[in-house]
């Protein structure tokens, strides 16, 4: 880390899900708009090494970085808000910290010392924070997961308390996000939860420099004075995080309050004025959308929409680019079968089957894919969605009735989808896996190059000979079936550089039927969108207009 780099630590109190990630990303956006080089980091207090093996229903989406890290979904917010890409160093957990410390203890690196939370765990946290910030970064924004008062968060809070002492006040800043509930019956905003949250933080040894109060509406100076009096935070360092129609409006609201100007002042930064014209254009585009299309998303994690966070945002972004609002109809794949399939999609303008793991709800997804294929409904399959599209085609077009994935049915005699046992990474490294390999961190992860077939719809959409998209999978199309599938009309329009892995499929005779092994949603942003999703939504708009 450069000795001139500033660090802003963002903590949260009272309750979870206040929007720490969006607040942190918005602050990064504001500083970036002033010409600064900004990066971000998320520290997660849970003991899992990473979220890769956690249920999406518990944790939400697993966001994959370009260099192959399985991370918290907040990193998706970060990449949608700022231009810098996140890396392996941008997210670490309690589990990863302990794993590193214990590995060094086994090697004897601590020379027989008794390993303790302080100093060994806190030192490892500090090391990862400082070494994870590149030399050319002006400001790093570090979000601490969890809520102040949680026992799991204490080592992280102690570590950043120590960093404040070691780096100095001129290089560090504490921003604390709290809840300011509005009691409708009394018609009052209540400041007591905020007071207690700041007091809890002070008990750990951290005095907040800036307070961000999440509430339904902006509060006046009388509430600010009261909060300032009881929290030891200057009145002009207290800001409102009010509810907005779209999260992409948050940077604009903070800028209107002078939030970024205050950060620049407190950190003694020399910057130009903020240029938020791109974000104003994004918000104006969102507000000016006319019409609506309905996308039926068929999955098994639909009870928690955060499980598909980046995918949802990619669809919304593509809608904005097409001038329409996207309504996502979540369909539980376990409820769909060949008999009732039509009832789920009679109001849908397009169908999407996202990624997932395990056999639960698979036949419902296959029935949905068949319905889209046979009824000329625009279809997009992602990861498992592509694999099941191949299974469906093999069963119902090639007539291979027991075609399946060896992941979902190990005893199938026609495994059109099988385990990838070997592949080459972008850096030339050869990876090998078996059915007995650990689940955690053993998939084909990160950005991989895909060569697009000349004359294909995919090449027309991307307007490129090859693209890099991010992957997270361990099963792939079985190459023994590729020729038969292509002879029957299924085109493999994208392949890995070595031609061994099938990356994209399409049906030329269909109005819009494309599926990809990668996760293109991870690179969609509100400013730039994503060509594949934009084309998909355009097809949905055309169907809607008929």
From Swiss-Prot:
How activity is controlled: the entry says: Allosterically activated by GTP, when glutamine is the substrate; GTP has no effect on the reaction when ammonia is the substrate. The allosteric effector GTP functions by stabilizing the protein conformation that binds the tetrahedral intermediate(s) formed during glutamine hydrolysis. Inhibited by the product CTP, via allosteric rather than competitive inhibition.
Please tell me where Mg(2+) binds in this chain: 74, 143
List the catalytic residues.
383, 519, 521
The EC number(s) this enzyme carries: 6.3.4.2
Enumerate the UniProt keywords alphabetically: ATP-binding, Glutamine amidotransferase, Ligase, Magnesium, Metal-binding, Nucleotide-binding, Pyrimidine biosynthesis
A Gene Ontology molecular function term for this protein is: CTP synthase activity
Q: Which domain of life is it from?
A: Bacteria
Residues reported in the UniProt entry to bind UTP: 16, 190-195, 226
Q: Name one GO biological process term.
A: pyrimidine nucleobase biosynthetic process
Q: Which SUPFAM superfamilies match?
A: Class I glutamine amidotransferase-like, P-loop containing nucleoside triphosphate hydrolases
Q: Does the keyword Metal-binding apply?
A: yes
InterPro entries under this entry? Class_I_gatase-like (IPR029062), CTP_synthase (IPR004468), CTP_synthase_N (IPR017456), GATASE (IPR017926), GATase1_CTP_Synthase (IPR033828), P-loop_NTPase (IPR027417)
Q: In which pathway does it act?
A: Pyrimidine metabolism; CTP biosynthesis via de novo pathway; CTP from UDP: step 2/2
Record: residues binding ATP: 17-22, 74
Which residue ranges are recorded for the region named Amidoligase domain? 1-269
| Function summary | Catalyzes the ATP-dependent amination of UTP to CTP with either L-glutamine or ammonia as the source of nitrogen. Regulates intracellular CTP levels through interactions with the four ribonucleotide triphosphates.
Query: To which protein family does this belong?
Result: Belongs to the CTP synthase family.
Q: How does it assemble?
A: Homotetramer.
Q: In the UniProt entry for this protein, what further remark is given in the free-text comments?
A: CTPSs have evolved a hybrid strategy for distinguishing between UTP and CTP. The overlapping regions of the product feedback inhibitory and substrate sites recognize a common feature in both compounds, the triphosphate moiety. To differentiate isosteric substrate and product pyrimidine rings, an additional pocket far from the expected kinase/ligase catalytic site, specifically recognizes the cytosine and ribose portions of the product inhibitor.
What PANTHER family does its record include? CTP SYNTHASE, CTP SYNTHASE-RELATED
Q: What is the name attached to this protein's record?
A: CTP synthase
Q: Which organism is it from?
A: Francisella philomiragia subsp. philomiragia (strain ATCC 25017 / CCUG 19701 / FSC 153 / O#319-036)
């Amino acid at each position: 880390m450069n000795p001139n780099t500033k660090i802003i630590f963002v903590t949260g109190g009272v309750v979870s899900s206040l929007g720490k990630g969006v607040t942190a990303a918005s602050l990064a956006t504001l500083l970036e708009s002033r010409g600064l080089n900004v990066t971000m980091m998320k520290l997660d207090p849970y003991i899992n090494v990473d979220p890769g093996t956690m249920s999406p229903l518990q944790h939400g989406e697993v966001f994959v970085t370009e260099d192959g890290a399985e991370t918290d979904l907040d990193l998706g917010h970060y990449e949608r808000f700022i231009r810098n890409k996140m890396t392996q160093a941008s997210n670490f957990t309690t589990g990863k910290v302990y794993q590193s410390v214990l590995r060094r203890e086994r090697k004897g690196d601590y020379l027989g010392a008794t390993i303790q939370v302080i100093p060994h765990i806190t030192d490892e946290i500090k090391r990862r924070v400082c070494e994870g910030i590149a030399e050319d970064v002006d400001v790093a924004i570090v979000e601490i997961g969890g809520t102040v008062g949680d026992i799991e968060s204490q080592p992280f809070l102690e570590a950043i308390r120590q960093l404040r002492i070691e780096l100095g006040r001129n290089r560090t800043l504490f921003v604390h996000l709290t809840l300011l509930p509005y009691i409708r019956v009394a018609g009052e905003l209540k400041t007591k939860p905020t007071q207690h949250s700041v007091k809890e933080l002070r008990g750990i040894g951290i005095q907040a420099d800036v307070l961000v109060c999440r509430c339904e509406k902006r509060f006046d100076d009388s509430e600010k004075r009261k909060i300032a009096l009881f929290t030891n935070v200057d009145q002009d360092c207290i800001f409102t995080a009010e509810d907005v129609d779209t999260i992409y409006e948050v940077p604009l609201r903070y800028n209107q309050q002078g939030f970024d100007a205050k950060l620049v002042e407190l950190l003694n930064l020399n910057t130009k004025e903020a240029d938020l014209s791109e974000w104003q254009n994004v918000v104006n585009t969102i507000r000016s959308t006319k019409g609506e299309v309905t996308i039926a998303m068929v999955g098994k994690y639909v009870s928690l929409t955060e499980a598909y966070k980046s995918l949802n945002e990619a669809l919304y972004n593509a809608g904005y680019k097409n001038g329409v609002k996207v309504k996502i109809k979540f369909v539980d794949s376990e409820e769909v079968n060949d008999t009732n399939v039509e009832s789920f999609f009679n109001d849908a303008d397009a169908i999407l089957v996202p990624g997932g793991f395990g056999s639960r709800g698979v036949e419902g997804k296959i029935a949905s894919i068949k319905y889209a294929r046979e009824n000329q409904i625009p279809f997009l399959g992602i990861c498992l969605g592509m694999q099941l599209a191949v299974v469906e085609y093999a069963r119902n077009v090639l007539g291979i009735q027991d075609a399946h994935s060896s992941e979902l049915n190990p005893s199938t005699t026609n495994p059109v989808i099988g385990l990838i046992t070997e592949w080459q990474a972008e850096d030339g490294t050869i990876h090998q896996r078996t059915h007995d390999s650990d689940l955690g961190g053993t998939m084909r992860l990160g950005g991989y190059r895909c060569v697009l077939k000349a004359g294909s719809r995919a090449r027309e959409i991307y307007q490129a000979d090859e693209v890099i998209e991010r992957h997270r999978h361990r099963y792939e199309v079985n190459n023994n079936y590729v020729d038969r599938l292509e002879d029957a009309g299924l085109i493999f329009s994208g392949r890995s550089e070595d031609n061994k892995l099938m990356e994209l499929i399409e049906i030329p005779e269909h109005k819009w039927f494309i599926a990809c092994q990668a996760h293109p949603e991870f690179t969609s942003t509100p400013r730039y969108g994503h060509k594949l999703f934009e084309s998909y939504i355009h097809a949905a708009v055309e169907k809607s207009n008929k």
